[in-house]
Amino acid sequence: MREPDRTPIQRRDILTGKLKQDSGGESRFLHISSAIVTARPDRAADLARHFATLPGTEVHAVQGAKIVLVLEGASVGEIRQPHGAISVMEGVFSANLVFEQILPADEREALS
């Protein structure tokens, strides 16, 4: 196993979603965010099934009009893309990110 790259993260890299990559072109980080989606109660179950098909998106709970999601990606941009798509879907009233964590990519295996 190779030694992980521990180069410090720059604030600008986080804000722009351009965290440095390793020499193989893969992101050195795993971004994990949770979101609460509020939807029409009569559409929540169908929307949750659809959200589960989106890359990097897991549905953790559906209760009434509320849907709890976890979004994972190699960058902030990879999280923003499905979040943006979800927020404008018919039947969705709001989609709010409520948590974000950035982990070194070498910790992915520990989460699996």
Swiss-Prot record:
* GO BP term, example: negative regulation of protein transport
Q: Which Pfam families match?
A: NapD
Give the superkingdom in one word. Answer: Bacteria
Q: Name one GO cellular component term.
A: cytoplasm
- Specify where it is mainly localized: cytoplasm
Q: Write out the GO MF terms.
A: signal sequence binding
Q: Where in the cell is it found?
A: Cytoplasm
Could you list this entry's UniProt keywords, alphabetically sorted: Chaperone, Cytoplasm
Q: Fill in the subunit field for this protein.
A: Interacts with the cytoplasmic NapA precursor.
Q: Which PANTHER family match?
A: CHAPERONE NAPD
Family per record: Belongs to the NapD family.
Functional summary from the UniProt entry: Chaperone for NapA, the catalytic subunit of the periplasmic nitrate reductase. It binds directly and specifically to the twin-arginine signal peptide of NapA, preventing premature interaction with the Tat translocase and premature export.
Which protein is depicted? Answer: Chaperone NapD
Query: What organism is this sequence from?
Result: Paracoccus pantotrophus (Thiosphaera pantotropha)
| Gene for this chain | napD
